[in-house]
């Protein structure tokens, strides 16, 4: 009802509704009625999205974590007049209204309607709708209801704040509208407008890992082919969805498409509490059978579980690790079930994470095979991976339900998808197993970048394939294995190539490491690393390893002590590099993947500096701000070439005792570029090659 009512208001509010404007854009014949969407996950956000599709209004979606400067640029470039946004984002725009000549209306997405139900502890409700027979204290799930109760108490404050903002907005020539006021009309029927398959229904501004965001235009055809084919995938057939927890940013195409899929399949949608402190509780209480996430979420989940196991008593820890290793050795098969039946370890862990979970589905980036396999065993769940882009309208490749290869990104979801690779650097499209930059053509592939004709033309090949910039190999069964991003492959001075994305994932497995950003070029013998650490977790590790006396750190001063200026003293650098070497020794990677030079930072990394709203790293920003360290390390290699030699660099300090030299036979395996691979034939099942096109003179296969 609210969707229909809001749709009606978009066409009739104040007599005209959302205005139509003419743009220098070929799509929609240059005519667009734009409604901005700028907020966090909420019911009203989703209602707005659906209402726009009915009314023929094009949504212009922006991440809520975009900086205010980026938002202002987008609003001015698109000459946007109507904007839906969260209440806590309004004041930032009002303060910059003098820079926003086109903006006229702000629609507050916050729900101000009071709920009738109240949590009553240890009492029975007379209407029988809810009974409490548990006389003990309420559990974690009850806390979420307390949060709702607190939110209700804040309603008056919100209303007062809105009234205050309305007065301020009025003086600036803006009008503020409460969402509920636009959904009061009772509308029985609405005629769906602009059903043309080529009509641009949404423009999504991508976060990007460098450069300014671009508006990805998605047509009705794109959205249909991004949503309907995945509904028929065999993962969902084998593990039917009944509940979905919406916690990934809905402004990101990944979560948004999943929402549409859930809507189409009649799946219950729970929206998380929007409080990061309660995310684990939200996941546990969601009862979702399939937990979708990105590498950052699953890396943290894995690190948390392993930390708790390592903190068990010596006997319990030994039993747990032996059971886990036994199950890993048997590939989590029938023998694994016997071991789990005896130890019940996975059930105990799973009960704390989400007892209903059957599947973990990773997207938005490659998860390291070790973490993927580890979570699969620890939680006794199936792990699958997909691949997609904003430009592809979300997931375009997805693993088959019987594909157990943790390196695989799966096969094409839609029958309209065609793909191939073209030779890039050392990756040859003409190899027996073709490798190179992934090129895609599909009905789900976007219709261009809004108002950026040149960027659109540059994004496609002459024969209409989108250039993803991702390096993959095409396996015998048509599935893809992700190798690296084209910008992430670096050639060192020896001519050896390293995969910085893989290195970043490798060392990010250390529980106290938030992010690892590797850098290298052809003037360097090995990569360096910018390491973001968590103060609290690092302190816990120092404490457990009896390092407090040596470092002079204690529970009272660690927050002040573990800052960038002191973290790069040799004692901390040695310690962290030791942990990195422990991780490295568990791999078969060659010595060029060892990081000798590291800079440790405990400063916050968020969307205002180094992270995109989907928690991908903006490498360009990191390299720029830490260029002082990069320059110091590069200078070391220059001096080495000129005949003088220095130790590894850490904020200008000479190398520490544990500098990792060019490799002992015991610790470092010899290697060449052939050692860096992401899969083997043994992992790949036979299949068709129908989607792999024949080569051309450009070595495109």
UniProtKB/Swiss-Prot annotation:
Cellular component aspect of the GO annotation: endoplasmic reticulum; membrane; symbiont-containing vacuole
Keyword terms: Glycoprotein, Repeat
Example of a GO MF term: long-chain fatty acid-CoA ligase activity
InterPro entries xrefs: AMP-binding_CS, AMP-dep_synth/lig_dom, ANL_N_sf
Domain of life: Eukaryota
Region (6 X 8 AA approximate tandem repeats): 653-700
PROSITE patterns assigned: AMP_BINDING (PS00455)
Pfam families from the UniProt entry: AMP-binding
Record's subcellular location: Parasitophorous vacuole
Family matches, as SUPFAM superfamilies: Acetyl-CoA synthetase-like (SSF56801)
Ranges occupied by Sequence repeats: 653-660, 661-668, 669-676, 677-684, 685-692, 693-700
Main location: other
Glycan attachment points: 40-41, 76, 111, 127, 139, 181, 189, 311, 334, 344, 477, 557
Biased composition (Basic and acidic residues): 656-701
Keyword Glycoprotein carried by entry: yes
Keyword Repeat (UniProt): yes
Composition bias, Low complexity: 642-655
Region (Disordered): 120-140, 641-701
Family affiliation: Belongs to the ATP-dependent AMP-binding enzyme family.
PANTHER family assigned: LONG CHAIN ACYL-COA SYNTHETASE 4 (PTHR43272:SF3), LONG-CHAIN-FATTY-ACID--COA LIGASE (PTHR43272)
Protein name: Octapeptide-repeat antigen
